[in-house]
Amino acid sequence: TKVVERGKGDGIYINTAGVGIVRHGLEISPSSVRPGDSVLLSGDLGRHGMTIMSLRAGLSFGDGLESDSAPLHESVAAVIRAGIPVHCLRDVTRGGLTATLSEIAESAGLTVKLNEMSIPVREDVRAACGLLGLDPLQVACEGRYLAVLPREHEEEALTLMRGCGVSAGACVIG
């Protein structure tokens, strides 16, 4: 959602939507999450949000800070095609990881236990967040997703995710 003041909507705004047929037969939603499931993250956090914030504020954090915006369909499709019983998938956009996990936990009626040390945040993102007083776990990503699935399938799912460039940094975070 993009909200702009009246008369301030100069420039180009692009909106997209997808229409398709679900052929996998899985119920992929927070209501499918079960106690003991693994939480997989497709890569490092916060690059998109910090890139946008730094550009808007005219700040520079070195050469490497760039958006993580990327298409996720190949990575997700690889896991689904392999027959892994994915319980929930969510993109890590508005509100970052914490908002996404809170939504899943609340909808599922469960709590989520994370290993914070396993959550990847690049040093330049961590530094930018520190300078601006932000928590990198609450910063938006545009090319990252969470997959919640049975623990016995986590290694296979990680292998498939890591085989796709966009999710080469996939890891188990909880």
Regions found by a protein language model. Name each.
Residues 1-174:
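Helix-biased detector of long, well-ordered alpha-helical tracts
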